[in-house]
């Protein structure tokens, strides 16, 4: 896995090439437009992606632990089996995204938009969803133990077979 810097990432994106399998950890990629890119199996740990455009991006199997995606847009993206533990996702937009099997352990997703997102089979333990919009989201078969859903919009949310031990609604 080759470690890339911001300039190299921007050149790859401009050429239309894939970033799949790249090491993008610990670099500042804030405000970068990744829309439509293949970023599957990337290492994005501790990466600054604040305000980045990640709409319709394939992030399947990527490690994004402790990344900062505050105010990022990830609409209609694929985040299957992505590790986002300890990540900062405040005010990010995940509308219509496929997030099956996502790991959000202790992530801060407060104020985010997860409208019609699929978070089934996710590890959502101790995740802060305060003030988030989960309108129509699918959380079936997820582990929500000790999560905070204070002031979150949960209208139409599927909590079927979820572990809701200690959840703060």
Spans of model-derived segments:
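Tandem repeat scaffolds
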Residues: 1-169
């Amino acid at each position: 896995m080759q470690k890339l810097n911001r300039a190299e990432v921007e050149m790859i994106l401009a050429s239309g090439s894939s970033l799949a399998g790249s090491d993008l950890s610990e670099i500042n990629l804030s405000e970068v437009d990744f829309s439509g890119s293949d970023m599957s199996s990337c290492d994005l740990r501790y990466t600054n992606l604040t305000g980045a455009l990640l709409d319709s991006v394939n992030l399947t199997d990527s490690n994004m632990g402790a990344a900062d995606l505050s105010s990022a847009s990830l609409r209609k993206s694929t985040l299957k089996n992505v590790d986002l533990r300890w990540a900062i996702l405040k005010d990010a937009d995940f509308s219509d995204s496929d997030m099956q099997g996502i790991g959000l352990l202790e992530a801060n997703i407060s104020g985010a938009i997860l409208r019609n997102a699929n978070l089934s089979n996710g590890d959502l333990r101790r995740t802060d969803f305060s003030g988030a919009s989960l309108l129509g989201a699918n959380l079936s078969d997820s582990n929500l133990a000790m999560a905070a859903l204070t002031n979150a919009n949960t209208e139409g949310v599927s909590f079927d077979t979820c572990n809701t031990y200690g959840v703060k609604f």
